[in-house]
Every structure is written in C-alpha cells, then in structure tokens.
C-alpha cells in the first residue's frame, strides 16, 4: 500500500513540475523580421583604425598592438573600398599590404558568412570575419591567420571604421 502511495505521490509531483515549467514560457509577440543583407553591410570605404598581432607559438599568447606600422598620424591609413558590383579597391600609403591590389570579393556563404574572400589575378585571400557587418554598423574586424605548413602561427587582426557608405 505504501508503495502505491509513493508511486502516486511521485507521479503527482512529476505532473505538477511539468505543468509548472510549461506554464513559465513567455509568449512571443511580433515577428523577427527579415535578416540583414550582409553584402550591403560591406559596401563603402573602410579605414584601418587598429592592427594587432597574436603569436600562437608563444606560451604567453599575448596580443601586441602594432597599429603604428600603419597609422602614423600623417599618412592616410590603409583603406578598403567594397563596391556593389563585388569589386574592391585598396589604398595604402604606409605599411604592408595584406589585401592585394584590388579585384573582386565575396563571402564563403552570403546568408551566414564566416570568411571574407578577396580574389585578384595574382592570388585568392581569405579572412575570418570578426563579426558580421550590418548596413548601419560603423566598425568591422577581420582576422588573417598566417600559417606555416598546416599549423597557424600568427593571427593579424585588422579593425576598420566606416568612413562612407
């Protein structure tokens, strides 16, 4: 008899708990809306605001700010301009050019991009996106992972500000 009572109490407890937790769900009102157009988010001219390097082989894993190699307060920092026809241009006065001479650009997936890909007659360059850029965002971060063989050795992080769009 006690076993039946324990089983009944346990079943009642389970039903009560499930009703309690199912009653706590908030109701969703409205619609989420259409996703942002990632291609439109890239349009415009972007100027370098920060450049950092992380040495993956160092036991400290520190990140060094090397912005001074590109930003000297006199010359215009590197600028990338992305056009609607999927072409891009690079303007650089000082520092090393990690982006080629210009060409065409794209994403690995236009709906859910992970990589920015730059195509030129000489090379194809691929950069990790540090976050997706929407049309109203004013900053963009991309990462270039330098490899030796199959192992990554450095991560260069470029942060840009939109100067027109």
Go through the PLM ranges and name each one.
Residues 103-105:
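Short beta-strand-centered aromatic/proline hotspots
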């Amino acid at each position: 008899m006690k076993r039946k009572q324990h089983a009944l109490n346990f079943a009642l407890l389970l039903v009560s708990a499930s009703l309690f937790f199912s009653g706590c769900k908030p109701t969703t009102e409205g619609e989420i809306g259409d996703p942002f157009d990632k291609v439109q988010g890239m349009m415009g001219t972007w100027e370098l605001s920060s450049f950092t390097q992380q040495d993956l082989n160092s036991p400290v894993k520190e990140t060094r700010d090397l912005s001074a190699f590109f930003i000297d307060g006199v010359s215009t920092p590197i600028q990338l301009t992305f056009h609607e026809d999927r072409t891009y241009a690079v303007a650089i006065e000082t520092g090393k050019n990690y982006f080629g001479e210009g060409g065409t650009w794209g994403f690995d997936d236009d709906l859910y991009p992970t990589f920015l890909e730059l195509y030129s007659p000489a090379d194809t360059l691929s950069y990790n996106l540090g976050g997706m850029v929407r049309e109203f965002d004013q900053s963009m971060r991309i990462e270039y992972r330098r490899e030796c063989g199959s192992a990554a050795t450095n991560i260069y992080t470029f942060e840009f500000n939109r100067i027109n769009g």
